[in-house]
From Swiss-Prot:
It catalyses: Transfers a segment of a (1->4)-alpha-D-glucan chain to a primary hydroxy group in a similar glucan chain. One of its GO terms (biological process) is glycogen biosynthetic process. Catalyzes the formation of the alpha-1,6-glucosidic linkages in glycogen by scission of a 1,4-alpha-linked oligosaccharide from growing alpha-1,4-glucan chains and the subsequent attachment of the oligosaccharide to the alpha-1,6 position. It comes from Shewanella baltica (strain OS195). GO terms for cellular component: cytosol. Monomer. This is 1,4-alpha-glucan branching enzyme GlgB. Its EC number is 2.4.1.18. SUPFAM superfamilies: (Trans)glycosidases (SSF51445), E set domains (SSF81296), Glycosyl hydrolase domain (SSF51011). Pfam families: Alpha-amylase, Alpha-amylase_C, CBM_48, GlgB_N.
């Protein structure tokens, strides 16, 4: 019933509204029928207002002046003879100004039932188009549609610099059935700062960043930012068509892993990041010159702590502010594509940090994470693990993956820490984890999510590459999902990386006793579609740079590094190398400063860089190095047992008509002359590459560019040749002209 003192509000509604305790605000505020449909009533809540008039948007005429219900800012009034709702604005007189405000409480819900269903089901691929802050137009009025998922909140408001961060000003519409809260706000400008203000069931109030924000403030501030209306105009049609037609498992793929904040810096003391335009002008030409086919970016979703390198993101949908805005990032990706360079994004779906403005206990409950810490917390990083069993969480992650691929044209995702997703007992002692429904250690919900993710992404985005960082022997990581695999395109070969780097750090005198560390990887090379990775993880935290790992004097260090790269580029599998490794960085990586580019003033570093460039060129020119990466017919040992000399010889084969390539790698400083190797074809051979050449900083021991096969069977081949094998060197030998008949 109405109170006698207040004819516009039901008993207690005005008090509840003033105290922020009235959640169904759309039933109260805005325009409503009154007096059994014979009149219209408008109610509004505007703190500090002196007077409020209702103005028709259609003709600009004043319809009514509202009564001031109380001094706290409640206004209400009937609209004379009008009975049909119409669009209006509120002309508000404040002590120092007058404002025209389009009343947000006159608009119906903008949510679509199909979107809501898919979001709850866990299959939404475009949730970012209705959640977060999106520019919309309804009934001819433009504004920002705010929407957030918080099913257990008692009340949610959008607060920002457009309402002086007043939590009672813009209380959102609640959808009880699905836990969504929404509000369409006209009079909001691009770049406005905002957050969501949530009242929990226990009465506590917390402000949170928008989980779907596409732009955020820089730390230590954490407001979300209304995005710009303008969008990037893409010019990469040719690349996207080529990508869709490329079978990457049969194509050359060498990725240059980049941390944008430390690849190179500017400013007198190197204190400034390069922005995206700088990166277009500097990074892209460098990668192109070095012959890499792809750039892999370490995470760029907004993260507050620089020392996390991006692996603890709070704004999963927001490109970090550090290098520019979203349109700048799109321009950078576009420029990569126009230069013929693919670009892969590191994507963190295994965990999220506990920053209070982030996802942790978002609505007062464990919404995105598991309630039980035995399943919901990550013991290694003190972070939280997503609840992959919850449909809305799956939609949040699936939509985010689609967001980067669809809106930014990334050519694939590299998923971080996949092993921690697959196992419930990952880094946990007995009693610290919960088994699955069958009593096992596999995280069945995470496995299902990864399968759905890969299946959906490969269907929606032709030619992308999905890459897993998975460090265990979990079976079927790169098997198709219809064969019960996880459905990734590639998996980092962590076993090869650990073994080969261990071998690299051994004294050449003792390498003969560890020969298997370079040969064992071929025992399992075809169980998955592997990518050989030497990533940022191998040159930090006291591990030292690659050059630092290698024993010996400088000459031996550089020669060994070149030979190692030769082995890596000859080994089956795609390639990934962290920035700085391509020129022999001496210091281990420091995310707070630029790479040591001054080292390129010295010939040994120039030599390593030139060697990598030539390896990449050969890799792209010779199909034998990629077309059968995942077929046993693409590789054959000539001799994998010469541990005494620490020499490795093998052949890489392409398809019919492709020239085979012979690799000879010597991992000791001993020069070998008159060394016989088997050859797959008769005729003259060319020394394509020799890491000991003077142009790479070597001692120039080799075969003067030519090797002649003779009809002497050796190492299972019908012909062979005597060659000179340089110390700590790599030779790549192939047919000089046309192909003779193979054995």
């Amino acid at each position: 019933m109405m109170t006698q003192a207040n004819a516009y509000f039901y008993d207690g509604a005005d008090v509840a509204l003033l105290n922020g305790q009235y959640t169904d605000v759309f039933s109260l505020l805005g325009m409503h029928s009154a007096n059994e449909g014979k009149a219209l009533i408008v109610r509004c809540f505007l703190r500090n207002a002196l007077s409020v008039d209702v103005i028709s948007i259609k003709d600009g005429r004043k319809v009514a002046s509202l009564d001031k219900v109380n001094e706290q800012g409640l206004f209400a009034g009937t609209l004379g003879r009008r009975v049909k709702p119409f669009l209006y604005l509120l002309r508000v007189e404040y002590p120092l100004c007058q404002l025209d405000i389009v009343d947000p409480y006159q608009f119906d819900s903008l949510l679509n039932s199909d979107d809501i269903y898919l979001f709850g089901e866990g299959s939404a691929e475009r949730a970012y188009e209705f959640l977060g802050a999106n520019w919309r137009q309804t009934q001819g009025v433009e504004g920002v549609h705010f929407c957030v998922w918080a099913p257990n909140a008692k009340r949610v408001s959008v607060v920002g610099d457009f309402n002086h961060w007043d939590d009672t000003r813009h209380v959102m519409r609640q959808h009880l059935a699905n836990g969504l809260w929404e509000l369409f706000l006209p009079n909001v400008v691009e770049g406005a700062h905002y957050k969501f203000d949530l009242v929990y069931q226990n009465g506590e109030r917390h402000t949170k960043s928008d989980p779907m924000a596409t732009q955020m403030e820089c730390a230590p501030h954490n407001a979300s930012i209304v995005p710009p209306k303008a969008h990037h105009s893409w010019n990469d049609t040719a690349w996207m068509s080529k990508r869709a037609a490329t079978a990457w498992h049969k194509a050359p793929m060498s990725a240059y892993e980049v941390h944008l904040g430390s690849w190179r810096r500017k400013g007198e003391q190197g204190e400034q990041y390069l922005d995206y335009q700088d990166l277009i002008e500097q990074l892209i030409p460098y990668v192109k010159e070095q012959g890499f086919t792809h750039i892999e970016l370490m995470p760029i979703s907004e993260f507050p702590f620089d020392g996390s390198w991006g692996y603890q993101p709070v704004g999963l949908y927001a490109p970090t502010h550090r290098f520019g805005d979203a349109n700048g990032l799109k321009a950078f990706v576009d420029a990569c594509h126009q230069a013929g360079i693919g670009i892969i994004l590191d994507w963190v779906s295994a965990h999220f940090p506990k920053d209070p403005h982030g996802l942790v206990r978002f609505d007062g409950t464990c919404l995105y994470e598991h309630e039980d810490p035995r399943k919901g917390t990550h013991p290694d990083w003190d972070t939280l693990i997503y609840n992959y069993d919850r449909g809305e969480v799956r939609s949040f992650l699936l939509s985010n993956a689609c967001y980067w691929l669809r809106e930014f044209h990334f050519d694939g995702l590299r998923l971080d820490a996949v092993s921690s997703m697959l196992y419930l007992d990952y880094s946990r002692e007995p009693g610290q984890w919960l088994p699955n429904a069958y009593g096992g250690r596999e995280n069945l919900e995470a496995i299902s999510f990864l399968q759905i993710l890969n299946q959906r992404l490969y269907q929606a985005f032709p030619g992308i590459c999905m890459i897993a960082e998975e460090s265990t022997a979990f079976a079927g990581v790169t098997k198709p999902t219809d064969q019960q695999g996880l459905g990734f395109g590639f998996k980092w070969n962590m076993g090869w990386m650990n073994d080969s780097l261990s071998y690299l750090g051994r004294d050449p005198l003792y390498r003969q006793f560890h020969h298997h560390q370079l040969t064992f990887s071929l025992m399992y090379a075809y169980t998955e579609q592997f990518m050989l990775s030497v990533s940022h993880d191998e040159v930090v935290h006291g591990k030292g740079s690659l050059l630092h790992k290698i024993p010996g004097d400088d000459w031996q260090k550089f020669a060994t590094l070149r030979a190692y790269y030769g082995f890596m580029w000859g080994h089956p599998g795609k390639k990934l190398l962290f920035m700085g490794c391509e020129f022999g960085q001496r210091n281990e990586w420091n995310h707070n400063q630029s790479l040591d580019w001054h080292l390129l003033a010295y010939e040994p570093h120039q030599g390593v860089q030139r060697w990598l460039k030539d390896l990449n060129q050969l890799y792209q020119d010779m199909p034998a190095l990629s077309v059968q990466d995942y077929e046993g017919a693409g590789f054959s040992w000539l001799d994998c047992e010469n541990s005494r000399d620490s020499i490795f010889t093998f052949v890489r084969y392409g398809l019919a008509g492709d020239a085979p390539l012979v690799f000879v790698i010597n991992m000791t400083p001993q020069l070998h002359t008159g060394f016989r190797i088997g050859l797959p074809l008769a005729g003259d051979y060319r020394e394509y590459l020799n890491s000991d050449s003077q142009i790479y900083g070597g001692s120039n021991q080799g075969n003067a560019g030519t090797v002649v096969a003779e009809s002497l069977p050796w190492q299972g081949m019908a012909q062979s040749a005597l060659i000179t094998v340089p110390p700590l060197g790599c030779l790549v030998i192939g047919p000089a002209t046309g192909l003779a008949e193979a054995n």
